[in-house]
Amino acid sequence: MRRAVIIVKATSLSSAVGTLRMYLSFRRRLFKRICLTTCKISILVFVIIFIVLPLIFKFSFALQKSILFLTFITYPPNLDLKKPEKSGLCATRNLYVTYRDQEEDIDVDVAVWHVLPNDLVRRFGKELQIDEATLSNMTAPEDVRDKVDKLAENDSSKYGNLERILHRSNLNLADEATQKELFEETLRATTNDIVLYLHGNTASRGASHRVELYKLLRSLNYHVVALDYRGYGDSADISPTERGVVYDALAVYQYITSISKNPVYLWGHSLGTGVATHLLSLLTDMSLPGPRAVVLESPFNNIREEICAHPFSKLYRHLPWFDYTISRPMYANELRFESDQHIAEFRQPVLMLHAEDDHVVPFSLGYKLYRTALDTRGKSWGPIEFHRFEKTSHYGHRYICRAPNLPEIVVRFFRTYRDEQY
């Protein structure tokens, strides 16, 4: 009996051991299968992210343009660009400059805002139907108020045509023909200088940080003309290229100079600095009169180094094939924005502004462009100025316009070269 019990127990123990061995074997096989599947998925993800996507980028001109210009990123949402007053800009005209792009054989509509200078708005506030609360806030920064007031037109006889338009009994400021006549007369009649603003990628001329700069410049008594290149805002729905956006800027520049003889300055921000330097080089090649000077805010030296430093490329910049699949294809498709080349091709004075805590266009690239300009530009050409904004101020990529010393820098720079021809 005892022997039978022992045999039964031994059999049960043997069965349990066998079951345990089978379970452990199954666990090992399952673990191997999971590890193998995980490795396969990891390799597949690696291949897709680090090989397939760069190769798609290399061979897709459309994708290259999309990533560079970022026209699909729009903010603020539901912004009506036809009504600049909804963005906080009174006495501002929305217009469209249409020109023929001969190379692409298409008509291009470039959407534009023309923001009137403060002194003009204050002078004709009643006629322009601006409320008292708004007018009371339209003052220049205190540090430059005296200098800015000197820029204002004091000769009342200059305003004869303006007054005739504004004092019509049937005046309708919402009428497009009336707006055109009125705003173009302000360019002709006044002596206020004009700033043509060239924005960077993403959004439109209505982005809040851009509007903030317009308000600052108008408070310094400058006309501000801001445009959206093709593909941006409510401009022509055409895929942008470097050549295309430069010619859009040229069309608006020629629109301004066809009306006014007053000094014009270019102000480029981020990608717009590449547009500005290329435009100045183009004007020189075409032997056309250029602007008095140019401001480059958050500039870079060329698109090859900028895309390598941009946050978007963080995953890819250390790949051995980064240049082969990303940089070189863009250059082959004429997406270069070579400010380090163009800055040696025009004579106008240059003011560079860059924040140390700029994480989109690193400070080092702006300073590198400055050093290149010092080495390559003619000794008799317009000077180069570089202003560094400390990282402790937290201006980043977009908000140098909030620097308390910026109005003094801008007014002094523009006044210095206002009557100079290079």
Language-model region placement:
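C-terminal catalytic histidine-bearing segment of alpha/beta-hydrolase fold enzymes
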Residues: 367-370, 375-422
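Gly/Ala-rich beta-loop-alpha elbow adjacent to hydrolase catalytic centers
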Residues: 268-272, 276
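Membrane-embedded segments
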Residues: 110-156, 160-253
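Hydrolase active-site cap/lid region
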Residues: 278-342, 348, 398-402
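Short beta-strand/loop motif that positions the catalytic acidic residue
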Residues: 345-347, 352-354, 358
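N-terminal membrane-anchoring alpha-helices
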Residues: 2-94, 404, 422
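Conserved alpha/beta-hydrolase "acid-adjacent" motif
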Residues: 359-368
